[in-house]
Amino acid sequence: MHSLKDLLADDCIADISMTGHYQGADEVCKGLQWPGPVMDLQRITFSNFVCRSHLDTAQQSAYSQHLYALEDHTHAFPFTFGGEWVNTYQKKNGKWKLSHIRFDLMFEDGNNSFVKDFWQLMDYSVFYGHTPIINPEIESPWIAIPYDDEPQSDAEQIFELEFKNNTGMDGGFFSLSHEVFTDDVFLNYAHHQNINKNYSGLADGDYHGRKAAINFFKGKQHKEARLQHNVSMAHLIIQNDQARAYMLRSEYHRIKHNIYDKTKIHMQPLSAVHEIDAKKENGVWKMMRMAYYPIMEFYPLPVECVCFDEYICGGNHWKRIKESIGIHV
């Protein structure tokens, strides 16, 4: 198994919102270390993975969620946090190496006493919660690498529609969302039953057309210092130039009335299902409909699973999940 240092260029740099700037492979390795006590559980899952490359340069982005916990005979004491990665790679002597690692903390919740003396945590009263490390208008993969050398399958392009929209919404870069939608896009958010941030006397509803859709997401974007829309690929049906995709939301810090006890710390919280209809326009897949269905399920997850997409997409796990939440496809 490769060590972290094997993956880094000798002159690699890292910029991490909680701890600062690091230069050189050895220092970067130190900067990425967990500074807190030895934990009984350390679970990390990645989602929203995008990577684009051109010649000898690649740009990759992803979201991660972390659940670290101590346990005694009766209770669990968890700390959850999540963030965004944008990493640059360079190919040298035929091998890809990380040349620049960027990480922005997006939320933290629970027993932050584990790290509060070592990390700059979120200031929820300010935009982004801290000085941003990542600028999506400059560093998101679609901007940094406008022409991808590696062709994508239809499935990859369809699932990436939501990854791109979420990057735009969470980072306040709504040009990405405009690129994703058809002109007549329809958002079916009536099931959300959340207070609309633009009109506080109303609940979320249905939104027709690109303008209404973008305005709806703009209203959501500023409700907190930073949002993190983690989604995992669950199921996809393609029929000629139309497709339906199912994505699962997971939010480690939004578990409603539940608590992380000794059982739930070993489970993946599922907070919503997104049903997405897409169609191909002039050879490009676009999102023409998204429906939002809130749920609250905890699904057993092996601690070694780092990508929930690979765990559920198209397999027996998805079959069990969809039956438990009443989806019939």
Please report, for each region that a protein language model flagged, where it lies by residue.
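Short, well-ordered alpha-helical packing segments
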Residues: 32-33, 83-87, 166, 217
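Aromatic-acidic/polar surface patches that form glycan- and anion
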Residues: 21, 78-79, 151-154, 158, ...
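A solvent-exposed, acidic/Ser-Thr-rich amphipathic alpha-helical stretch
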Residues: 2-66, 183-255
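A structural signal for well-ordered alpha-helical segments within the folded catalytic domains
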Residues: 2, 26, 80-83, 156-159, ...
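Flexible domain-boundary/linker segments
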Residues: 21, 118, 175, 182, ...
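A beta-strand edge to alpha-helix "cap/lid" segment located at domain peripheries
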Residues: 36-153, 222-225, 233, 237-329
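Short acidic-aromatic low-complexity motifs
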Residues: 1-10, 159-180, 184
